[in-house]
Protein backbone atom coordinates (compact mmCIF):
# COMPACT_ATOMS: atom_id res chain seq x y z
CA UNK A 1 0.00 0.00 0.00
CA UNK A 2 1.21 3.51 -0.79
CA UNK A 3 0.43 6.87 0.78
CA UNK A 4 -1.64 7.75 -2.30
CA UNK A 5 -4.28 5.26 -1.13
CA UNK A 6 -4.62 6.76 2.35
CA UNK A 7 -6.16 9.78 3.96
CA UNK A 8 -3.47 12.47 3.85
CA UNK A 9 -3.10 15.03 6.64
CA UNK A 10 -0.85 17.94 5.68
CA UNK A 11 0.17 20.03 8.69
CA UNK A 12 1.52 23.49 7.91
CA UNK A 13 3.89 24.45 10.72
CA UNK A 14 4.34 27.93 9.27
CA UNK A 15 0.58 28.47 9.62
CA UNK A 16 0.86 27.22 13.20
CA UNK A 17 3.61 29.78 13.84
CA UNK A 18 1.45 32.50 12.26
CA UNK A 19 -1.45 31.66 14.57
CA UNK A 20 0.83 31.63 17.60
CA UNK A 21 2.14 35.09 16.65
CA UNK A 22 -1.42 36.38 16.13
CA UNK A 23 -2.45 35.13 19.55
CA UNK A 24 0.66 36.59 21.17
CA UNK A 25 -0.26 39.95 19.68
CA UNK A 26 -3.73 39.57 21.21
CA UNK A 27 -2.27 38.60 24.58
CA UNK A 28 -0.29 41.78 25.15
CA UNK A 29 2.07 41.24 28.08
CA UNK A 30 0.50 37.91 29.06
CA UNK A 31 2.33 34.66 28.40
CA UNK A 32 0.87 32.42 25.69
CA UNK A 33 1.05 28.81 26.89
CA UNK A 34 -0.18 26.45 24.15
CA UNK A 35 -2.53 23.59 24.90
CA UNK A 36 -1.03 20.53 23.20
CA UNK A 37 -3.33 17.95 24.78
CA UNK A 38 -4.88 15.17 22.70
CA UNK A 39 -1.69 14.94 20.62
CA UNK A 40 -1.89 18.67 19.86
CA UNK A 41 -5.52 18.36 18.79
CA UNK A 42 -4.67 15.47 16.48
CA UNK A 43 -1.75 17.17 14.73
CA UNK A 44 1.19 15.62 16.59
CA UNK A 45 2.34 16.98 19.95
CA UNK A 46 6.06 16.43 19.34
CA UNK A 47 6.48 18.39 16.08
CA UNK A 48 3.92 20.99 17.16
CA UNK A 49 5.63 21.67 20.49
CA UNK A 50 9.00 21.67 18.74
CA UNK A 51 7.90 24.48 16.42
CA UNK A 52 6.11 26.41 19.16
CA UNK A 53 9.24 26.24 21.31
CA UNK A 54 11.19 27.71 18.40
CA UNK A 55 8.59 30.50 18.24
CA UNK A 56 9.06 31.31 21.93
CA UNK A 57 6.62 29.13 23.87
CA UNK A 58 8.03 28.05 27.22
CA UNK A 59 4.94 26.61 28.94
CA UNK A 60 2.58 23.94 27.63
CA UNK A 61 -0.64 22.29 28.78
CA UNK A 62 -1.62 18.64 28.48
CA UNK A 63 -4.59 16.79 29.95
CA UNK A 64 -3.19 13.39 30.90
CA UNK A 65 -0.12 12.29 32.81
CA UNK A 66 1.01 10.08 29.90
CA UNK A 67 0.82 13.08 27.56
CA UNK A 68 3.03 15.07 29.90
CA UNK A 69 5.61 12.31 30.21
CA UNK A 70 5.73 11.91 26.42
CA UNK A 71 6.05 15.67 25.90
CA UNK A 72 8.87 15.92 28.43
CA UNK A 73 10.69 13.14 26.61
CA UNK A 74 10.11 14.85 23.27
CA UNK A 75 11.38 18.22 24.46
CA UNK A 76 14.51 16.65 25.91
CA UNK A 77 16.68 18.99 27.95
CA UNK A 78 14.69 22.10 27.07
CA UNK A 79 13.44 23.67 30.30
CA UNK A 80 9.76 23.84 29.46
CA UNK A 81 7.03 24.04 32.08
CA UNK A 82 4.44 21.36 31.41
CA UNK A 83 1.12 21.66 33.24
CA UNK A 84 -1.09 18.57 33.62
CA UNK A 85 -4.77 19.50 33.75
CA UNK A 86 -5.89 16.22 35.35
CA UNK A 87 -3.84 17.21 38.39
CA UNK A 88 -2.37 14.82 40.93
CA UNK A 89 -4.56 11.79 40.37
CA UNK A 90 -4.24 8.73 42.65
CA UNK A 91 -0.96 6.94 42.07
CA UNK A 92 0.48 9.61 39.77
CA UNK A 93 2.80 11.36 42.22
CA UNK A 94 6.08 9.61 41.43
CA UNK A 95 5.62 9.91 37.67
CA UNK A 96 4.64 13.59 37.91
CA UNK A 97 7.67 14.39 40.03
CA UNK A 98 10.00 12.21 37.96
CA UNK A 99 9.08 13.98 34.72
CA UNK A 100 9.12 17.41 36.40
CA UNK A 101 5.49 18.03 35.54
CA UNK A 102 3.34 20.64 37.28
CA UNK A 103 -0.09 19.31 38.27
CA UNK A 104 -3.07 21.63 38.11
CA UNK A 105 -4.62 20.65 41.44
CA UNK A 106 -8.40 20.35 41.18
CA UNK A 107 -9.59 19.36 44.66
CA UNK A 108 -8.60 19.40 48.32
CA UNK A 109 -7.64 15.69 48.21
CA UNK A 110 -5.32 16.42 45.27
CA UNK A 111 -3.70 19.27 47.20
CA UNK A 112 -3.18 16.98 50.17
CA UNK A 113 -1.76 14.18 48.00
CA UNK A 114 0.71 16.51 46.28
CA UNK A 115 1.73 17.98 49.63
CA UNK A 116 2.50 14.45 50.84
CA UNK A 117 4.46 13.78 47.63
CA UNK A 118 6.61 16.81 48.49
CA UNK A 119 7.94 15.20 51.66
CA UNK A 120 11.47 15.12 50.19
CA UNK A 121 11.43 18.72 48.94
CA UNK A 122 9.16 21.49 47.72
CA UNK A 123 7.14 20.86 44.56
CA UNK A 124 5.62 23.24 42.03
CA UNK A 125 1.84 23.35 41.65
CA UNK A 126 -1.02 25.24 40.06
CA UNK A 127 -4.50 25.56 41.57
CA UNK A 128 -7.67 25.25 39.49
CA UNK A 129 -10.65 27.28 40.69
CA UNK A 130 -14.14 26.41 39.48
CA UNK A 131 -15.83 29.71 38.67
CA UNK A 132 -18.98 28.32 37.08
CA UNK A 133 -18.20 25.53 34.63
CA UNK A 134 -18.82 22.84 37.26
CA UNK A 135 -16.36 20.31 35.99
CA UNK A 136 -12.97 20.19 37.72
CA UNK A 137 -11.70 22.70 40.24
CA UNK A 138 -11.85 23.95 43.80
CA UNK A 139 -14.98 25.85 44.69
CA UNK A 140 -14.21 29.39 45.94
CA UNK A 141 -15.24 28.40 49.47
CA UNK A 142 -12.78 25.48 49.33
CA UNK A 143 -10.03 27.86 48.28
CA UNK A 144 -10.78 30.01 51.33
CA UNK A 145 -10.40 26.95 53.56
CA UNK A 146 -7.17 26.05 51.80
CA UNK A 147 -5.46 29.42 52.12
CA UNK A 148 -6.51 29.56 55.76
CA UNK A 149 -4.71 26.28 56.50
CA UNK A 150 -0.98 26.74 56.02
CA UNK A 151 -0.21 23.05 56.57
CA UNK A 152 -1.98 22.09 53.35
CA UNK A 153 0.31 24.26 51.24
CA UNK A 154 3.51 24.41 53.26
CA UNK A 155 5.54 22.14 50.94
CA UNK A 156 4.13 23.49 47.68
CA UNK A 157 5.27 26.33 45.47
CA UNK A 158 1.92 27.48 44.12
CA UNK A 159 2.96 29.41 41.02
CA UNK A 160 -0.32 29.77 39.15
CA UNK A 161 -4.07 29.94 39.77
CA UNK A 162 -6.29 29.05 36.80
CA UNK A 163 -9.92 28.80 35.84
CA UNK A 164 -11.67 27.88 32.60
CA UNK A 165 -14.32 29.80 30.67
CA UNK A 166 -17.43 27.86 29.71
CA UNK A 167 -18.81 30.24 27.06
CA UNK A 168 -15.81 32.13 25.66
CA UNK A 169 -16.90 31.25 22.12
CA UNK A 170 -20.08 33.27 22.73
CA UNK A 171 -18.83 36.75 23.66
CA UNK A 172 -22.24 38.08 24.66
CA UNK A 173 -22.97 35.24 27.10
CA UNK A 174 -23.43 36.62 30.65
CA UNK A 175 -21.49 33.75 32.22
CA UNK A 176 -18.25 35.21 30.85
CA UNK A 177 -18.52 38.31 33.04
CA UNK A 178 -19.71 36.22 35.99
CA UNK A 179 -16.71 33.91 35.74
CA UNK A 180 -14.35 36.85 35.37
CA UNK A 181 -15.65 38.45 38.57
CA UNK A 182 -15.49 35.18 40.50
CA UNK A 183 -11.96 34.54 39.28
CA UNK A 184 -10.78 38.00 40.28
CA UNK A 185 -12.24 37.51 43.76
CA UNK A 186 -10.71 34.06 44.18
CA UNK A 187 -7.29 35.04 42.82
CA UNK A 188 -7.15 37.92 45.30
CA UNK A 189 -6.83 35.30 48.05
CA UNK A 190 -3.44 34.35 46.57
CA UNK A 191 -1.56 37.64 46.22
CA UNK A 192 1.58 37.44 44.12
CA UNK A 193 0.51 34.22 42.38
CA UNK A 194 0.24 34.40 38.59
CA UNK A 195 -3.26 34.08 37.10
CA UNK A 196 -4.60 32.36 33.97
CA UNK A 197 -8.17 32.43 32.65
CA UNK A 198 -8.33 32.89 28.86
CA UNK A 199 -8.47 30.06 26.36
CA UNK A 200 -8.65 30.73 22.61
CA UNK A 201 -12.02 32.44 22.86
CA UNK A 202 -11.02 34.26 26.02
CA UNK A 203 -8.16 35.97 24.20
CA UNK A 204 -10.75 37.69 22.02
CA UNK A 205 -12.97 38.83 24.92
CA UNK A 206 -10.75 41.75 25.83
CA UNK A 207 -7.83 42.77 28.01
CA UNK A 208 -9.62 42.06 31.29
CA UNK A 209 -9.51 38.31 30.60
CA UNK A 210 -5.80 38.03 29.81
CA UNK A 211 -4.14 38.30 33.23
CA UNK A 212 -0.61 36.82 33.38
CA UNK A 213 -0.97 33.76 31.17
CA UNK A 214 -3.32 32.60 28.40
CA UNK A 215 -3.92 29.02 27.27
CA UNK A 216 -5.03 28.87 23.62
CA UNK A 217 -5.77 25.58 21.95
CA UNK A 218 -8.10 25.33 18.96
CA UNK A 219 -7.16 28.70 17.45
CA UNK A 220 -3.53 27.63 17.29
CA UNK A 221 -4.63 24.77 15.06
CA UNK A 222 -6.95 26.67 12.72
CA UNK A 223 -10.28 26.89 14.54
CA UNK A 224 -11.88 30.29 14.98
CA UNK A 225 -12.41 31.59 18.53
CA UNK A 226 -16.19 31.73 18.05
CA UNK A 227 -16.63 28.47 16.16
CA UNK A 228 -16.42 30.05 12.73
CA UNK A 229 -13.52 31.13 10.49
CA UNK A 230 -11.61 34.19 11.74
CA UNK A 231 -9.43 36.43 9.53
CA UNK A 232 -6.47 36.29 11.94
CA UNK A 233 -6.39 32.49 12.06
CA UNK A 234 -4.99 30.29 9.28
CA UNK A 235 -5.76 26.67 8.51
CA UNK A 236 -3.02 24.42 9.89
CA UNK A 237 -4.31 20.98 8.88
CA UNK A 238 -5.53 20.07 5.40
CA UNK A 239 -7.12 16.63 5.25
CA UNK A 240 -7.51 14.90 1.88
CA UNK A 241 -8.64 11.49 0.70
CA UNK A 242 -8.48 9.81 -2.72
CA UNK A 243 -11.32 9.01 -5.06
CA UNK A 244 -11.58 5.24 -5.48
CA UNK A 245 -14.24 5.09 -8.15
CA UNK A 246 -16.50 7.33 -10.23
CA UNK A 247 -19.91 6.00 -11.22
CA UNK A 248 -23.26 7.22 -12.50
CA UNK A 249 -26.19 6.57 -10.18
CA UNK A 250 -29.37 6.31 -12.29
CA UNK A 251 -32.39 8.40 -11.46
CA UNK A 252 -34.50 6.73 -8.77
CA UNK A 253 -31.67 4.68 -7.27
CA UNK A 254 -30.16 5.32 -3.85
CA UNK A 255 -26.71 5.50 -2.29
CA UNK A 256 -25.30 3.87 0.82
CA UNK A 257 -26.67 2.35 4.00
CA UNK A 258 -30.32 2.94 4.70
CA UNK A 259 -30.85 4.26 1.16
CA UNK A 260 -30.40 7.70 2.69
CA UNK A 261 -30.23 9.64 -0.59
CA UNK A 262 -32.10 8.97 -3.82
CA UNK A 263 -31.07 10.41 -7.17
CA UNK A 264 -33.65 12.74 -8.71
CA UNK A 265 -31.71 12.57 -11.97
CA UNK A 266 -28.77 10.60 -13.32
CA UNK A 267 -25.93 11.70 -11.02
CA UNK A 268 -22.17 11.32 -11.40
CA UNK A 269 -20.78 10.27 -8.03
CA UNK A 270 -17.24 9.91 -6.67
CA UNK A 271 -16.68 7.27 -4.01
CA UNK A 272 -13.99 8.63 -1.68
CA UNK A 273 -11.76 6.61 0.67
CA UNK A 274 -12.77 8.35 3.90
CA UNK A 275 -15.39 7.54 6.50
CA UNK A 276 -16.10 7.79 10.18
CA UNK A 277 -13.02 5.65 10.90
CA UNK A 278 -11.06 8.54 9.38
CA UNK A 279 -12.77 11.23 11.43
CA UNK A 280 -15.66 12.12 9.11
CA UNK A 281 -18.70 12.36 11.42
CA UNK A 282 -21.68 10.18 10.54
CA UNK A 283 -23.80 13.28 11.14
CA UNK A 284 -22.14 15.05 8.19
CA UNK A 285 -25.00 13.97 5.91
CA UNK A 286 -27.13 15.73 4.69
CA UNK A 287 -25.26 19.06 5.06
CA UNK A 288 -21.68 17.88 4.65
CA UNK A 289 -19.47 19.10 1.82
CA UNK A 290 -15.96 18.54 0.50
CA UNK A 291 -13.73 20.72 -1.66
CA UNK A 292 -12.79 19.42 -5.08
CA UNK A 293 -11.73 21.03 -8.35
CA UNK A 294 -12.24 24.58 -7.11
CA UNK A 295 -15.67 24.22 -5.53
CA UNK A 296 -17.58 22.83 -2.57
CA UNK A 297 -19.42 19.65 -3.47
CA UNK A 298 -22.11 17.90 -1.42
CA UNK A 299 -21.82 14.52 0.24
CA UNK A 300 -24.56 12.10 -0.80
CA UNK A 301 -25.98 9.45 1.52
CA UNK A 302 -24.80 8.26 4.88
CA UNK A 303 -21.17 8.35 5.92
CA UNK A 304 -19.94 4.77 6.32
CA UNK A 305 -16.88 3.48 8.12
CA UNK A 306 -14.51 3.76 5.17
CA UNK A 307 -16.33 5.62 2.40
CA UNK A 308 -18.31 8.70 1.47
CA UNK A 309 -20.06 9.55 -1.79
CA UNK A 310 -19.71 13.00 -3.37
CA UNK A 311 -21.67 14.64 -6.18
CA UNK A 312 -19.23 15.33 -9.04
CA UNK A 313 -21.77 15.89 -11.80
CA UNK A 314 -20.24 18.08 -14.55
CA UNK A 315 -16.77 17.73 -12.98
CA UNK A 316 -14.34 16.26 -15.50
CA UNK A 317 -11.45 16.23 -13.01
CA UNK A 318 -13.05 13.47 -10.95
CA UNK A 319 -11.16 10.24 -11.53
CA UNK A 320 -9.65 7.48 -9.37
CA UNK A 321 -6.64 8.75 -7.44
CA UNK A 322 -7.67 12.42 -7.46
CA UNK A 323 -7.58 13.91 -3.95
CA UNK A 324 -10.65 15.43 -2.30
CA UNK A 325 -10.25 17.96 0.55
CA UNK A 326 -12.32 17.06 3.62
CA UNK A 327 -11.31 20.29 5.35
CA UNK A 328 -8.32 22.60 5.38
CA UNK A 329 -6.93 25.38 3.24
CA UNK A 330 -10.05 25.69 1.06
CA UNK A 331 -12.82 24.35 3.31
CA UNK A 332 -12.35 25.74 6.85
CA UNK A 333 -12.49 23.20 9.64
CA UNK A 334 -15.15 25.31 11.39
CA UNK A 335 -17.43 25.06 8.35
CA UNK A 336 -16.86 21.32 8.00
CA UNK A 337 -17.62 20.88 11.70
CA UNK A 338 -20.74 23.04 11.63
CA UNK A 339 -22.19 21.00 8.76
CA UNK A 340 -22.03 17.95 11.03
CA UNK A 341 -23.37 19.73 14.10
CA UNK A 342 -20.04 19.52 15.90
CA UNK A 343 -16.96 21.64 16.61
CA UNK A 344 -13.50 22.17 15.17
CA UNK A 345 -12.18 20.59 18.38
CA UNK A 346 -13.88 17.30 17.52
CA UNK A 347 -13.05 17.32 13.81
CA UNK A 348 -9.36 17.85 14.59
CA UNK A 349 -9.01 15.41 17.47
CA UNK A 350 -10.81 12.64 15.56
CA UNK A 351 -8.03 12.46 12.99
CA UNK A 352 -6.76 8.91 13.22
CA UNK A 353 -3.51 7.05 12.77
CA UNK A 354 -4.95 5.60 9.55
CA UNK A 355 -4.18 8.96 7.99
CA UNK A 356 -0.65 9.71 6.81
CA UNK A 357 0.72 12.90 8.36
CA UNK A 358 2.96 15.15 6.32
CA UNK A 359 4.60 18.22 7.84
CA UNK A 360 5.51 21.27 5.78
CA UNK A 361 7.07 24.58 6.72
CA UNK A 362 9.62 23.71 9.37
CA UNK A 363 9.12 20.02 9.99
CA UNK A 364 11.79 18.17 11.88
Curated annotation (Swiss-Prot):
Organism field: Caulobacter vibrioides (strain ATCC 19089 / CIP 103742 / CB 15) (Caulobacter crescentus)
Reactions the enzyme catalyzes: L-alanine = D-alanine
Chain's role: Catalyzes the interconversion of L-alanine and D-alanine. May also act on other amino acids.
Metabolic or biological pathway: Amino-acid biosynthesis; D-alanine biosynthesis; D-alanine from L-alanine: step 1/1
Keywords associated with the record: Isomerase, Pyridoxal phosphate
E.C. numbers: 5.1.1.1
Active site: 37 (proton acceptor), 257 (proton acceptor)
Any GO BP annotation: D-alanine biosynthetic process
Any one Gene Ontology cellular component term annotated for this protein: cytosol
Binding-site positions, substrate: 135, 305
Residue intervals passing through the bilayer: none
Family membership noted in the UniProt record: Belongs to the alanine racemase family.
Pfam family name, one: Ala_racemase_N
Domain of life: Bacteria
SMART domains membership: Ala_racemase_C (SM01005)
Gene Ontology MF, one: pyridoxal phosphate binding
Segment forming the signal sequence: none
N6-(pyridoxal phosphate)lysine: residues bearing it: 37
Name of the protein in question: Alanine racemase
Required cofactor names: pyridoxal 5'-phosphate
